UniProtKB/Swiss-Prot annotation:
Pfam families: YozE_SAM_like. Belongs to the UPF0346 family. InterPro entries: UPF0346 (IPR010673), YozE_SAM-like (IPR023089), YozE_SAM-like_sf (IPR036806). It comes from the Bacteria. This is UPF0346 protein MW1311.
Length: 73
Protein backbone atom coordinates (compact mmCIF):
# COMPACT_ATOMS: atom_id res chain seq x y z
CA UNK A 1 0.00 0.00 0.00
CA UNK A 2 1.26 3.46 -0.88
CA UNK A 3 1.93 6.08 1.78
CA UNK A 4 1.07 9.39 0.13
CA UNK A 5 -0.91 12.37 1.36
CA UNK A 6 -4.12 13.38 -0.34
CA UNK A 7 -2.34 16.46 -1.70
CA UNK A 8 0.31 14.31 -3.38
CA UNK A 9 -2.44 12.29 -5.05
CA UNK A 10 -4.26 15.46 -6.12
CA UNK A 11 -1.15 16.63 -7.95
CA UNK A 12 -1.51 13.57 -10.21
CA UNK A 13 -5.04 14.69 -11.09
CA UNK A 14 -4.10 18.21 -12.19
CA UNK A 15 -4.62 18.77 -15.88
CA UNK A 16 -7.72 16.61 -16.21
CA UNK A 17 -10.53 18.30 -18.10
CA UNK A 18 -13.26 17.47 -15.60
CA UNK A 19 -14.49 18.62 -12.18
CA UNK A 20 -11.85 16.57 -10.37
CA UNK A 21 -9.13 18.28 -12.39
CA UNK A 22 -10.61 21.69 -11.62
CA UNK A 23 -10.74 20.87 -7.90
CA UNK A 24 -7.11 19.73 -8.08
CA UNK A 25 -6.18 23.11 -9.57
CA UNK A 26 -8.08 24.95 -6.81
CA UNK A 27 -6.28 22.86 -4.17
CA UNK A 28 -2.92 23.57 -5.84
CA UNK A 29 -3.65 27.31 -5.84
CA UNK A 30 -4.59 27.31 -2.13
CA UNK A 31 -1.26 27.80 -0.36
CA UNK A 32 -2.78 26.99 3.06
CA UNK A 33 -4.23 23.62 2.03
CA UNK A 34 -3.20 20.88 4.53
CA UNK A 35 -0.63 19.19 2.30
CA UNK A 36 0.39 16.44 4.71
CA UNK A 37 -3.03 15.23 5.82
CA UNK A 38 -4.88 12.22 4.56
CA UNK A 39 -7.82 12.18 7.01
CA UNK A 40 -11.18 12.60 5.26
CA UNK A 41 -12.72 14.68 8.06
CA UNK A 42 -9.83 17.12 8.33
CA UNK A 43 -9.71 17.63 4.57
CA UNK A 44 -13.46 17.95 4.06
CA UNK A 45 -13.76 20.39 6.97
CA UNK A 46 -10.99 22.49 5.47
CA UNK A 47 -12.63 22.56 2.04
CA UNK A 48 -16.02 23.43 3.53
CA UNK A 49 -14.76 26.23 5.78
CA UNK A 50 -11.62 27.67 4.15
CA UNK A 51 -10.54 28.92 0.79
CA UNK A 52 -12.59 29.73 -2.27
CA UNK A 53 -13.53 26.27 -3.46
CA UNK A 54 -16.29 26.60 -6.04
CA UNK A 55 -17.19 22.98 -6.80
CA UNK A 56 -19.73 20.85 -4.91
CA UNK A 57 -18.49 18.69 -2.04
CA UNK A 58 -19.54 15.62 -4.02
CA UNK A 59 -16.53 16.25 -6.28
CA UNK A 60 -14.25 16.10 -3.24
CA UNK A 61 -16.02 12.96 -2.02
CA UNK A 62 -15.49 11.25 -5.38
CA UNK A 63 -11.87 12.38 -5.54
CA UNK A 64 -11.19 11.14 -2.01
CA UNK A 65 -12.71 7.77 -2.89
CA UNK A 66 -10.43 7.62 -5.94
CA UNK A 67 -7.50 8.48 -3.64
CA UNK A 68 -8.26 5.56 -1.31
CA UNK A 69 -8.39 3.19 -4.29
CA UNK A 70 -5.15 4.66 -5.68
CA UNK A 71 -3.38 3.99 -2.38
CA UNK A 72 -4.06 0.27 -2.72
CA UNK A 73 -1.97 -0.10 -5.87
Amino acid sequence: MKNYSFYQFVMTVRGRHDDKGRLAEEIFDDLAFPKHDDDFNILSDYIETHGDFTLPMSVFDDLYEEYTEWLKF
